[in-house]
Amino acid sequence: MNQDEQKRAAAHAAIQHIPAGCIVGVGTGSTANYFIDALAGIRSRIDGAVASSEATARRLSAHGIEVMDLNNVDELPLYVDGADEITPHLHMIKGGGGALTREKIVAAVAKKFICIADQSKLVDVLGKFPLPVEVIPMARGHVAREIVRLGGQPMLRQGFTTDNGNVILDVHALQILNPIELETELNQITGIVTNGLFARRPADLLLLGDEGGIRTIAI
């Protein structure tokens, strides 16, 4: 299978994990889009979905899936999303699509987080993919200086504004040996909304598409 076929296979595999009558949290990005397309086939079996971005909400609605406000949802059994990088410990870098803050909120609420990905996303050490950091616009310079102090090379994502009205700094040159520690340290910098490390709340299950089919990794 090529990369797109692996993404599609992982997305379809996640459908088997959705309980009937539940509300599903849905991520953002190319792999999540395959999941949304697959979810449309069982929309009569679910009560609705919580979207992690405006783009995801539009795609869900286009498929006739009810999009629900997270504030009106008492329980979220499942969240399904992709990753830009993921380790065997199921720590991730996410946010390549710029939806990291809402993704992190939905993941925090969900009882179970299933990551769907193609085999290229599985890495031993996080950091080859630039780490997205969502920043309040007026704090951009301050945050960039603090990130340099930590050894990173921040670059403003040009022409991009998040759904929350903020900017993204993509941080290069980080070899993230302790993702939990770095996630915590970055979030203590004033002006950072959140960063794209999902280590304090990792995935519970990885459905990984590769040439041979689907590999399942759990913690």
Curated annotation (Swiss-Prot):
EC top class named in words: isomerase
Swiss-Prot/TrEMBL catalytic activity: aldehydo-D-ribose 5-phosphate = D-ribulose 5-phosphate
Q: Name one GO biological process term.
A: D-ribose metabolic process
Lineage: superkingdom: Bacteria
Q: Does the record bear Isomerase in its keywords?
A: yes
GO cellular component terms, A-Z? cytosol
Per the Swiss-Prot or TrEMBL record, the active site comprises 103 (proton acceptor)
Pathway in which the depicted protein is active: Carbohydrate degradation; pentose phosphate pathway; D-ribose 5-phosphate from D-ribulose 5-phosphate (non-oxidative stage): step 1/1
| One GO molecular-function entry | ribose-5-phosphate isomerase activity
Cross-referenced InterPro entries, in alphabetical order?
A: NagB/RpiA_transferase-like, Ribose5P_isomerase_typA_subgr, Ribose5P_isomerase_type_A
Asked whether the UniProt record includes Isomerase among its keywords, one would answer yes
Where is the chain membrane-spanning? Answer: none
What EC identifiers does the entry list?
A: 5.3.1.6
Q: What does this protein do?
A: Catalyzes the reversible conversion of ribose-5-phosphate to ribulose 5-phosphate.
Q: Which HAMAP family match?
A: Rib_5P_isom_A
Under which name does UniProt file this protein? Ribose-5-phosphate isomerase A
Q: What is the lineage of its organism?
A: Bacteria, Pseudomonadati, Pseudomonadota, Betaproteobacteria, Nitrosomonadales
